[in-house]
Curated annotation (Swiss-Prot):
This is Melanocyte-stimulating hormone receptor. It is a multi-pass membrane protein. Signal peptide: none annotated. PANTHER family: G-PROTEIN COUPLED RECEPTOR (PTHR22750). The gene is MC1R. It is found in: Cell membrane. Receptor for MSH (alpha, beta and gamma) and ACTH. The activity of this receptor is mediated by G proteins which activate adenylate cyclase. Mediates melanogenesis, the production of eumelanin (black/brown) and phaeomelanin (red/yellow), via regulation of cAMP signaling in melanocytes. One of its GO terms (molecular function) is melanocyte-stimulating hormone receptor activity.
Amino acid sequence: MPAQGSQRSXLGSLNSTLMATPSLGLAANQSGPQCLEVSVPDGLFLCLGLVSLVENMLVVAAIAKNRNLHSPMYCFICCLALSDLLVSISNVLETAVMLLLEAGALAVGATVVQQLDNVIDVLICSSMVSSLCFLGAIAMDRYISIFYALRYHSIVTLSRAQWATAAVWAASILSSTLFIAYYDRTVVLLCLVVFFLAMLVLMAVLYAHMLTQACQHVQGITRLHKRQHLVQQGFGLKGAATLTILLGVFLLCWGPFFLHLTLIAVCPQHPTCSCVFKNFKLFLALIICNAIVDPLIYAFRSQELRKTLKEVLLFSW
């Protein structure tokens, strides 16, 4: 990747998967289909990253402070927060470096820029892969806690959770390094897309099965009550809404980015696909939004964690 390209890319080597796609660089007024290009100001991009950064730092600090939260479930939640933290740090860092280079406030050689670009790319990709893995791990942990409740503490031990998280981090770093090294190979892009779809299917199946089991449990409890139908209907709607939020946020925030990768592999030269490529920075912003939403869904719903978070905030003041 040329030095100038590395200074301007929104995601370094990942964005340079499109180097072979001339249409990506088309201006909005050039020939081709009418494209909807959503501009994400650098200021907004940085603000989203900083909000996510602070939010996930608080989650990590709260879990580290409270020994009652040193359990397998919170181990996965903490690692998810760390992954989202790295997503935010890497994107904010790259955007800040890019702005400084464009403003001429940072004078470094092309070789240094290239090396920095590669390091940030590996950091971004590994944090994305690990974030997806820990979302799947949280779903599996909840599934085991429901369907194997009596054996849960013997199946999901803290040591096993720690080994699993170490394996996820190692696999994420290795896979992201290979991805950056072979970003121009179609099979690499397709592997990432298949991985995303596998995580989506895994989460959908596990959470749907948990919802079905919960509805059956409520049905058994309310069988003798007069307002059985209303209770079942209310619980079913609440469960369906929760499932929709979980999978909807996941698909909305991650789906466009992996659609982007799919189109690079399938139709890199097609004018319609080039319209999607123009919104690459928007897709990154959505991933950062996911890093903001994750603590709200998985961490802050815990009363114990919220209590510890208040203590952390009061202590910091």
